[in-house]
């Protein structure tokens, strides 16, 4: 049985670093990699890839763009991981990142979570606490945080 590893991407260029860490610390044949991207429900049309209707494109242009970007980011990550020989699955979640990551990690009974870190100043951390810190406080599995600046 393959050990599940959750890679929480955000669709930014920092996601490439998370995939590099997965390649470095995980092995095909030993780990199944699960890519998760959480999208704010105000800017999401669905929890997965599906055709976006003309109505949605006209009435919700920001959500349409966000949905397309999220789907493309997950698909690109999966292509890269599969090309490296990993069994992998992807998921979009309409939720705040902490809730989405914690619930998916619990559902999968993850052996590891790989997550990024935003480098905020003190005021930024006070106003918008770290997602990675919140995840670490709520899960029972190890969390590998990519603290490299992109």
Place the predicted regions along the sequence by residue.
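A short acidic, glycine-rich active-site loop
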Residues: 55-72
